[in-house]
Amino acid sequence: MLPDIQSTKGDGEGESLSWVGMEQIDLPIDIAGRPVSAKVNAGINLLSSPEAEKGIHMSRLYLLLDELTQGEITPALLQHVLKAFLVSHQGRSDEASIEISGDLLLSRKSLNSNHSGWKAYPLTLSAELRQSFTVTLKVGIPYSSTCPASAALSRHVAGLQFSKDFGNRIDRLPAAEIADWLVEKGMPATPHSQRSWAWVSIRLNPEAKSLPVIELIDYAEVALGTAVQTVVKRSDEQAFAVANGQNLMFCEDAARRLNNVFRCAPFCEAFDIRVEHQESLHPHNAVARIHWKGSKNVT
């Protein structure tokens, strides 16, 4: 019989360990009907006892993880695998967790030209089985943000330039001349904008039968109004410019928009939202956070 060192009594018996497991396991999985090349962390706690063992049997957990590759990931499947983790270490563990990270590729339509292109959304899916079972889904959504203050300053410059160019003729200018000026000189200053990120982490409603990852992305992109595009023709770029002009926002505005929409999302029991505007004006980022614990307390 081969020796089983893991099952022998360890040093400092009686000392429990809060988590023991494996990280960065490669698994091909299916999330929302899409293939994801994932990195998986999986582990359990190790309880203290008079006969405490050196460690866990990691190969048992590794083999059980293969069940995640046999179909679309659902809350029920995650709970089943976590329960199997505990059964595989009967009496030695009462907590188990799985964390799945990867990029979800979605085909997104252009704003105007009816083309489609692919966009990657980084996500992390965390499932824990302790006294209760919880699933947390975190997704990163890229979008564009245009500074309201910069837009106001740009409009002010345009007004000054208009007055300078036309002087006392302002009250009797032909519409055609004004239109020509706007086309040629109507933007003497431009507001600054930047690629931005919304990191939305939600705790799923316990009744959830599937992972609402696409719904989460759609909710966020509609609320923000300026989702980063894939394929872009000139008409799409113009539509994108209009969208940015109609959705001027500081990071605080973006956080509040997301708060309003996810407070009403049927699949969301609680959330933690972080928005990051990667400033083009500054060498630092502008960041806002908002948390909701399923009550009226928001911080």
From Swiss-Prot:
It catalyses: GTP + H2O = 7,8-dihydroneopterin 3'-triphosphate + formate + H(+). Its EC number is 3.5.4.16. Gene3D superfamilies: Urate Oxidase (3.10.270.10). Pathway: Cofactor biosynthesis; 7,8-dihydroneopterin triphosphate biosynthesis; 7,8-dihydroneopterin triphosphate from GTP: step 1/1. GO terms for molecular function: GTP cyclohydrolase I activity. Keywords: Hydrolase. GO terms for biological process: tetrahydrofolate biosynthetic process. The record marks C147 as: May be catalytically important. Converts GTP to 7,8-dihydroneopterin triphosphate. Belongs to the GTP cyclohydrolase IV family. This is GTP cyclohydrolase FolE2. The gene is folE2.
